[in-house]
Swiss-Prot record:
Catalyzes the reversible isomerization of glucose-6-phosphate to fructose-6-phosphate. This is Glucose-6-phosphate isomerase. GO terms for biological process: gluconeogenesis; glucose 6-phosphate metabolic process; glycolytic process. It comes from the Bacteria. The keyword Isomerase applies.
Length: 557
């Protein structure tokens, strides 16, 4: 054989990460305007529907090769296997040796795959439903025999953010009750919320829900203690006071009993439910009190529908997978450090706050499952506001600032056209306002994407620099047919599973939160100094010592 025959170079097989790095180098300066010019059918290619919602990611800075490479990345990380593990009874939360089975909270009661699990959950929910109906029918009475008309949910984190967010979002679906019923929320440990609320309430007609997974959270127990003192001062210290005016939700029945909550008023959840995933359980009692039993069942059914979509749908059409992969592309390859969530519906006022916990407490990690430091940036900073209000706050930065930001736009397609609407006599004018919000939602996503090219030709001519729009800010748009218990359940479940997808890519555990633990321990060490039980500051840094001296009035500053 002729040794001088030129050898063809061997074809190098790139890993998905290498392929994405290569694609990033090729496309990092490509503008969304150019992507839309090259692909006239982007909406058809990069939009996925799932019954009564639409997920449009055509304004993301991707093309088909990038999308394919992202899917290959997910496959290389064995995402399918991890999804199967999630929907099992395996201890996927390895640092706490617990399952993560929030999906089980929305299983149909007659589920045949996990019949015992479904029954366990159903038994607690049925007890909750009985309480809800009793309160709605005016049959739940306080210690003096008066009907309960005010319910105060005391919790923090997952025991507060989720129930508050959903109760507010679904206010149009508030059920009629025999007597007017108000649901209020208290979370801050400083007592300011509770102080504002208590003077508006009558002890005789007030019921407190104390929600704490561990029933040891100091924020919650301090508020509960104050509420208890308020009741006892007005009604006395008989055991009937606690029995009639306190409900407990926790994994710890013994601690609830020790605190004074009667076993009949204790509702249980399980260690395999993370706090930020717990609103589907009896932690969601305030939601059920707002939208009723049938509304809560529709809420669970919507989430279960997304569980099935996530579990069974091919990745190119799988909305939570696509949501997660768009975030991976933006964070790890386009180097975007923050992500804004912009709902164009005032009812979603608390949705961003809820997502901040869901995303940043889950994926704000820097240690891989093998104990090594992560190789890539993990969770971006999540922020945002109701879109129309945000337009008058920080959209200036989005449009003309120096920060690159990815955005989620969320809006219902229809509103003010159903029997649940409270102010029917004003429906025509309010429908016009809804259309105004939708037009602004579409306009802002368009301007963020295309910049000056979104303007009319005559508007672009001779624009001074301070009126220029660069564009190329990536976004997705989620349209819901309407904001209802069912679609609200779907929306939350989509983001839950998006978070899980990203945790698999980053190889981190999204179900623990060790970063929040030590701060609470240090606070417990400092409290005796502030209340005068200890005076030893020697173990503290100079800054903390100085601040304590100021607080105690001992500083010469």
């Amino acid at each position: 054989m002729n040794k001088n025959i030129e050898q063809f170079p061997r074809k190098t097989t790139l890993t998905p990460q290498q392929k994405l790095e290569q694609l990033m180098e090729q496309h990092k300066t490509v503008h969304l305007t150019e992507l839309f010019d090259k692909e006239q059918d982007r909406f058809a290619k990069y939009c996925v529907g799932c019954e009564d919602l639409v997920f449009d990611f055509s304004k993301q800075r991707i093309n088909q090769p990038i999308l394919d490479a992202l899917v290959q990345l997910a496959e290389s990380k064995q995402l399918n296997k991890w999804i199967d593990t999630l929907f099992s009874q395996n201890k996927i939360n390895y640092t706490e040796q617990r399952e993560a089975m929030h999906w089980a909270l929305r299983l149909p009661a007659d589920n045949q795959v996990y019949p015992e699990l479904a029954k366990q959950v159903s038994d607690q929910l049925e007890r909750m439903y009985q309480l809800v109906n009793k309160i709605h029918e005016g049959q739940y009475r306080g210690a003096t025999g008066e009907v309960i008309q005010d319910v105060v949910n005391i919790g923090v984190g997952g025991s507060d953010l989720g129930p508050l967010m959903v109760s507010h979002a679904l206010s149009d679906f508030k059920v009629k009750t025999a007597k007017p019923l108000n649901i209020r929320f208290v979370s801050t440990m400083d007592g300011s919320q509770l102080s504002d609320i208590l003077h508006q309430l009558r002890p005789e007609t007030t019921l407190f829900i104390v929600s704490s997974k561990s029933f040891s959270t100091i924020d919650t127990l301090s508020n509960a203690h104050t509420a208890r003192k308020w009741l006892e001062k007005a009604l006395g210290r008989e055991s009937s006071i606690l029995k009639s005016h306190f409900i407990g939700v926790s994994t710890k029945p013994d601690k609830m009993t020790e605190w004074g909550i009667h076993p009949d008023n204790q509702f249980l959840l399980w260690d395999w439910v993370g706090g930020r995933y717990s609103l589907w359980s009896c932690i969601g009692l305030p939601i059920a009190l707002t939208i009723g039993v049938e509304g809560f069942k529709a809420f669970l059914a919507g989430a279960h529908g997304i569980d099935e979509h996530f579990r069974t749908t091919e990745f190119h059409q799988n909305i939570p997978v696509l949501m997660g992969l768009m975030g991976i592309w933006n964070t790890n390859y386009l180097n975007l450090k923050t992500h804004a969530v912009l709902p164009y519906d005032g009812r979603l006022k608390y949705f961003t706050s809820y997502l901040q916990q869901l995303e940043m407490e889950s994926n704000g990690k820097s240690t891989q499952r093998n104990g090594q430091k992560v190789e890539n940036t993990t969770c971006p900073i999540v922020w945002g506001e109701v879109g129309p209000n945000a337009q008058h706050a920080f959209y200036q930065l989005l449009h003309q600032g120096t920060q690159k930001v990815s955005c989620d736009f969320i809006a219902p397609m229809h509103r003010y056209n159903a029997n649940h609407f409270t102010y029917v006599e004003n429906a025509d004018a309010l429908i016009d306002q809804h259309l105004l919000a939708l037009s602004n939602c579409l306009a802002q996503s368009r301007l963020l994407a295309f910049g000056n090219d979104a303007l009319k030709v005559d508007q672009r001519e001779q624009l001074p620099a301070y009126k220029q729009y660069e564009g190329n800010q990536p976004s997705t748009t989620m349209l819901l047919k309407e904001l209802s218990p069912r679609t609200m359940g779907k929306l939350i479940a989509l983001y839950e599973h998006k978070v899980f997808v990203q945790s698999v890519i980053w190889d981190i555990n999204p179900f623990d939160q060790w970063g929040v633990e030590k701060g609470k321990e240090i606070a417990n060490d400092l409290l005796p100094i502030l209340n005068g039980e200890s005076s030893d500051l020697s173990h503290l840094d100079d800054s903390t010592q100085g601040l304590i001296q100021f607080l105690l009035g001992k500083s010469n500053g």
